[in-house]
């Protein structure tokens, strides 16, 4: 655990004026379950530019626009859109975000569904031997989203750009 913490603190990019807001997922939770260690809290304590928002799900307000960070835990489905669609459908209307950033599946995908702009966030690591043995896809990359809003935070225009980090 200490090596992982040290690696994140030393290697994760740091740029003046930019904060990274992050959540943890199911693999990170294993540290909590097995050793009682919350690596998210430890990272945020060491890096003032990194804001830990908790485990699995968090909402961030960017002005009046609500952005939800969500880390799933189920396996990949037959279609990339399926898990996002089912997740958006179960969010109560009063809680619905304008933008959903969904991790865990190591794939990239973008769609607008039920008035939510949905991004499946890819991996930033190479495919693991375990994922390879299961025949799971692993895309490396990131999204940049350029959007405009009205005075209520509703999205008027959205221009997604995928950055492919494939070797």
Annotate each predicted stretch with a short phrase.
Residues 14-16, 61, 92-96:
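Flexible, charged surface loops at secondary-structure boundaries
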Residues 24-29, 34, 148-167:
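Charge-rich, low-complexity terminal tails
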Residues 32-33, 61-65, 69-70:
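Short, solvent-exposed polar/charged micro-motifs at secondary-structure junctions
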Residues 3-7, 34, 55, 95, ...:
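Short, well-structured alpha-helical interface segments that form or flank functional binding sites
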Residues 1-52:
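Core catalytic region of metal-dependent phosphoesterases/phosphodiesterases
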Residues 56-63, 111-113:
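Short acidic-hydrophobic surface loop/beta-edge motif
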Residues 52-56, 139:
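Residues that act as N-cap/strand-start positions at coil-to-secondary-structure junctions
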Residues 66-161:
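Conserved beta-sheet core of the metallophosphoesterase superfamily
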